[in-house]
């Protein structure tokens, strides 16, 4: 007979290190985005500060979302995750009908002066609901029909709608993170392998449908095989690497970037890390990356000592999203990965990513406020994990 579980939140202090790291990234992004966007902002709006003001508003909304989420008990997402996911799916479908077309993709919905990217919300809604199912179903998660299939249906719906936008990079990230969460949650490996058999070839087929994706993969393959030369390096990557080269160890100084002046496309979004390297040098890029590594370390520590399986899974999911995005963005700008279009969390210009990721950090900090990160006694096993019991609580889909 199991002991009674006290689900009443125990309030400790939030994890200060994570909070400081995130706010530091947000504040530093103001100077970086201003420098990276000033030239293009002047060309488009005749005002070099236009995009800075927009970014400042988004940082403010992100901070507001984070502090609201800090006060919101994460256990409530057990009941809210499914309605949120259904709403996110509705927004994804709506995007395909009334979405704003930009650069050949329909990924945004216009709300007056604001544009939101529903896939950013859907990504977190899906992961949160998977965490709910994993912690609620218990041992049933290992059953193919009753546990595994319902979760794959949710993943398939979200991924399919994102692919139709089209946004292959986001769809790939959603699939990868979902599979990681299912693996951590205790899904049978043979079920994951059975799913991967058709999914991987299918994703490869979708990847090869667009010629520009084939070109990216070929160029990346040439780099891996050592056949890169100055003439074959893609223009955007070449300009990004020039920015790193100009920056050297200590950089050319804040606001002194030359690559932002119509040389480097997407300098304020996908390739903002190159501008950091140019203006602040190797030292600056390492400082930014250390902040992300600090968030990763503290996030996984929060997960380790979370008071229950749901909190543990949420912390793992949120931390994994931020870590993966930061590493992929940096890897792309350094030529280590094919171009993906994924932003650098808390730094790149972009409202939906900033607001939803900041809100997710607020959830992470709420978990930390109910977690003892410095246990002085033997840790009690997490209640609600796959190995904690055989019975599942109700039928949740």
Residue locations for each model-derived region?
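Hydrophobic, glycine- and aromatic-enriched re-entrant/interface helices and adjoining loop segments
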Residues: 102, 106-108, 191-287, 306-314
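Membrane-proximal intracellular helices of multi-pass ion channels
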Residues: 211, 286-289, 296-299, 303-311, ...
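Hydrophobic alpha-helical transmembrane segments
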Residues: 57-62, 279-299
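Membrane-helix boundary/helix-loop-helix interface segments in multi-pass membrane proteins
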Residues: 2-25, 31-166, 330-345, 349, ...
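Transmembrane alpha-helix boundary/anchor motif
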Residues: 64, 72, 129, 204, ...
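Loop-to-helix entry and N-terminal half of a specific, functionally important transmembrane alpha helix
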Residues: 300-341, 347
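Hydrophobic alpha-helical segments of polytopic membrane proteins
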Residues: 82-83, 87-89, 145-163, 168-208, ...
